[in-house]
């Protein structure tokens, strides 16, 4: 519903702005530019979708091997001690714990198609434990904020878009996204823990969060000591080595589970092809809307206004061009994806703005969509502190993304 209003607004605002330019500035080219943008944006959307087919097929094939090889179950065992402390109201050994673990593990691995049904199943289990059926319980809120914080280890789709749009190193945003999504997740956990009075100084929580924080601090310190050229070399090398290790690890996991690795890959690759075909109309719709909005001059006015406000505060404004992606992300994943593609198309995939838009896209998730779908599936209408905690995690992710992008690419 939100995306419907946003899409309509793109066209209505574009019409008003274009009409004002025609009447007051005698700009007779604005409407031809708008119409031309609808054709060029449609063509761009189709070309992107076509190019996505091969890489999506590759990675969804690899992911299917990992899924059937028991990688999600491994994540569940590793995270078990931590989540028993973050969800103290769930009885020990309750089956809903497995659904929560599997959903979060699927999200971290980028398995969106697996994550959503697992998440809905987890919500059903949490609702069974919920004494007030119309009100969100503490475990529900913690679970959903962890989802909205966008924690991910493998930002496949973003790297795929970068590759399709001609980035020199599509994986160069891999490490920045890992760092930014860590901060958004940490902020979400801390916010919910304060609301729910969860002891953050518990030994298990301190071990996990403290250890991860030290690791992230060490990574940031290390990259802060390098020259710009060294940062590019180290981050790209690490990203590619890590991704190839994941491929090898998933294949080994499949071998250990004695599955037919090749057949699993082909099965997942077919899903990748179907996914690429399915997104064509959605990508055409959002890119045409954004194209019309930009061709009318409305996008330039919006960015220029924010740019001037930022400069008045004495802050560098290079990041402003990517802000539309950050503002759209809590509302609509496809809308934010379209704005990310638009930023890379307009400024270039290897520009500061293009890279930052990708980091914004990968550092948070669609907060309002997730809350609506997950709470709606079990009939919860009173969300308590879920929205403020989710938005706080989004804000932390956006701020972290900007600072980290300046560190790596500024």
List each language-model region with its residue ranges:
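Generic hydrophobic alpha-helical membrane-segment signal
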Residues: 2, 91, 98-100, 135-140, ...
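Hydrophobic alpha-helical context, especially transmembrane and signal-peptide helices
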Residues: 5, 33, 94, 101, ...
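Membrane-embedded alpha-helical segments and adjacent helix-loop junctions characteristic
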Residues: 29-128, 257-346
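Hydrophobic alpha-helical segments, principally membrane-spanning helices and signal/leader peptides
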Residues: 36-39, 46, 95-97, 132-140, ...
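Generic signal for short, ordered secondary-structure residues
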Residues: 101, 105, 140, 231-234, ...
């Amino acid at each position: 519903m939100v995306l419907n209003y946003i899409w309509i607004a793109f066209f209505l605002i574009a019409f008003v702005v274009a009409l004002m330019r025609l009447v007051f500035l005698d700009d007779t080219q604005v409407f031809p530019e708008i119409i031309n943008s609808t054709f060029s944006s449609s063509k761009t959307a189709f070309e992107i979708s076509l190019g996505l087919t091969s890489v999506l097929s590759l990675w969804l094939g690899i992911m299917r091997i990992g899924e059937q090889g028991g990688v999600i179950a491994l994540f569940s065992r590793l995270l078990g001690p931590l989540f028993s402390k973050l969800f103290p109201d769930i009885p020990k050994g309750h089956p809903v714990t497995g659904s929560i673990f599997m959903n979060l593990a699927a999200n971290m691995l980028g398995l969106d198609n697996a994550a959503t049904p697992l998440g809905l199943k987890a919500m059903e289990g949490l609702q069974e434990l919920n004494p007030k059926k119309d009100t969100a319980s503490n475990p529900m809120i913690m679970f959903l904020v962890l989802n909205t914080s966008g924690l991910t280890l493998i930002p496949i789709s973003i790297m795929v878009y970068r590759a399709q749009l001609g980035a020199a190193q599509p994986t160069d945003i891999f490490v920045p996204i890992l760092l930014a999504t860590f901060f958004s997740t940490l902020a979400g956990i801390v916010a919910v823990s304060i609301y729910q009075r969860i002891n953050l100084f518990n030994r298990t929580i301190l071990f996990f969060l403290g250890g991860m924080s030290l690791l992230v601090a060490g990574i940031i310190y290390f990259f802060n000591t390098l020259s710009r050229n060294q940062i590019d070399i180290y981050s790209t090398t690490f990203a590619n080595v890590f991704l190839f290790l994941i491929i090898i690890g998933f294949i080994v996991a499949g071998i250990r589970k004695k599955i037919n690795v090749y057949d699993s890959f082909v099965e997942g690759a077919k899903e990748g092809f179907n996914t690429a075909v399915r997104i064509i109309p959605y990508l055409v719709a959002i890119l045409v809307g954004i194209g019309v909005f930009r061709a009318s001059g409305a996008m330039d006015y919006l960015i220029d206004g924010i740019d001037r406000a930022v400069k008045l505060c004495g802050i560098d404004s290079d990041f402003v061009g990517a802000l539309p992606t950050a503002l759209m992300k809590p509302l609509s994943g496809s809308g934010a994806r379209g704005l990310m593609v638009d930023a890379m198309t307009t400024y270039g995939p290897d520009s500061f703005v293009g890279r930052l838009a990708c980091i914004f896209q990968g550092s948070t998730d669609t907060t309002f969509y997730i809350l609506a779908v997950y709470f709606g599936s079990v009939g919860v209408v009173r969300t308590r502190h879920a929205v403020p905690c989710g938005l706080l995690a989004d804000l932390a992710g956006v701020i972290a993304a900007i600072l980290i992008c300046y560190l790596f690419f500024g």
